[in-house]
Curated annotation (Swiss-Prot):
Single GO MF annotation: structural constituent of ribosome
Assembly with partners or alone: Part of the 30S ribosomal subunit. Contacts proteins S9 and S11.
UniProt GO BP: translation
Family the entry assigns: Belongs to the universal ribosomal protein uS7 family.
InterPro entries referenced in this protein's UniProt entry, alphabetically: Ribosomal_uS7, Ribosomal_uS7_bac/org-type, Ribosomal_uS7_CS, Ribosomal_uS7_dom, Ribosomal_uS7_dom_sf
HAMAP family on file: Ribosomal_uS7_B (MF_00480_B)
GO cellular component: small ribosomal subunit
Organism in which the protein naturally occurs: Francisella tularensis subsp. holarctica (strain LVS)
Name of the featured protein: Small ribosomal subunit protein uS7
Pfam family, one: Ribosomal_S7
Length: 157
C-alpha cells in the first residue's frame, strides 16, 4: 500500500444519452479492456429492452430501483484477534453499496444463459426489481452472513 496521500476522487461525467452519473458508472463497470463504446451498446441495448417490456416506465428509474434492491446494507470483514479470524459485520458506505450492487448485477448477468450481454443485463435488472435473481440472492447471503456473525460486532475498528 502506498505511503503517499490518498489519490483524489475523480468526478465521473454523466453519460451522453441519459445524463446520469449512475448509468455512466454502470457503463464503466461493464467495460472490458477499455472498450467503452461496446459497453455503452450493451447498457443502452439493455435499457431499450427494459423500455420495450414496460413502455410507461423510465428505464433509468427502473435501473436505480434494481440497484437499490441489490445493494447491501451490511457486509462482513475479516479481523484477526489473538490468532483467530472473525467475520465482523460492518455497515457499508453508500458509495461502496452502489459499487457492490453494480458489480453483483454484472456478475449475475455474465452467468446467465441469454444470447447477448444486453439481454442478460436487462433480464437481471428486471428480476432485481421484482426481488428475484442471482444478484438479489447474493445480497441476501451477505446479510445472512452478517446476521450470523452479529456476536462479533463489538470487534469494530
Amino acid at each position: 500500500m502506498s505511503r503517499r496521500n490518498r489519490a483524489p476522487k475523480r468526478d465521473i461525467l454523466p453519460d451522453p444519452k441519459y445524463k446520469s452519473q449512475v448509468v455512466a458508472k454502470f457503463v464503466n463497470h461493464i467495460m472490458l479492456s477499455g472498450k467503452k463504446s461496446i459497453a455503452e451498446k450493451i447498457v443502452y441495448g439493455a435499457f431499450d429492452k427494459i423500455k420495450a417490456k414496460d413502455a410507461s416506465a423510465n428505464e433509468v428509474e427502473v435501473f436505480e430501483k434494481a440497484l437499490e434492491s441489490v445493494s447491501p446494507m451490511v457486509e462482513v470483514k475479516s479481523r484477526r484477534v489473538g490468532g483467530a479470524t472473525y467475520q465482523v459485520p460492518v455497515e457499508v458506505r453508500p458509495e461502496r453499496r452502489q459499487t457492490l450492487g453494480m458489480r453483483w448485477i454484472i456478475d449475475a448477468a455474465r452467468k446467465r444463459k441469454e444470447n447477448t450481454m444486453g439481454d442478460r443485463v436487462a433480464a437481471e435488472i428486471l428480476e432485481a426489481v421484482e426481488g428475484r435473481g442471482a444478484a438479489v440472492k447474493k445480497r441476501e447471503d451477505t446479510h445472512k452472513m452478517a446476521e450470523a456473525n452479529k456476536a462479533f460486532a463489538h470487534f469494530r475498528w
